[in-house]
């Protein structure tokens, strides 16, 4: 292949990546992306009202670098900690927020997105959203999507240690686990409230590894 052919191949490769919403990667990294369990997978990422919401930016970046298509869903509480624009820019996808403003299609947006998802990840997951999922409540886009989704669900809790240890939260987590919901964390360390304890969001690298594990067996 001559120089002109190589350049043409590279241009076509970049166009293919852009068309599929992937982060452009060097040619030597293309094979690694395509061999990733995340390549071409659709991941819905729920971001809820925890100080750890800012870590969703890093999570999106890492998932997209491995070839995943990430669709952020931001709750009202989550929007207090990170902006929709940040998530949209990193994911290159619109950010779902309002259950009552889902676009012009005939099918409700949360239903369409749930039907297409390979995995629903909630990171960070607050005590509130864990309770909503456990009791089948559907007050917003994320909780409604959860009731429709038939894909695997992974939750990464982040909250005050006393909230995590409360009998209600413990019972809600146990309920969800019996339904097949996967959990990762929380981690132990200094919390935003000033206490040492269990409640920190699990490291992003660890969440990505867990996602790879879940999607690698589908």
Task: Show the residue positions of the predicted features.
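A cross-family phosphate/adenosyl-ligand binding-site feature
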Residues: 22, 27-154, 161-218
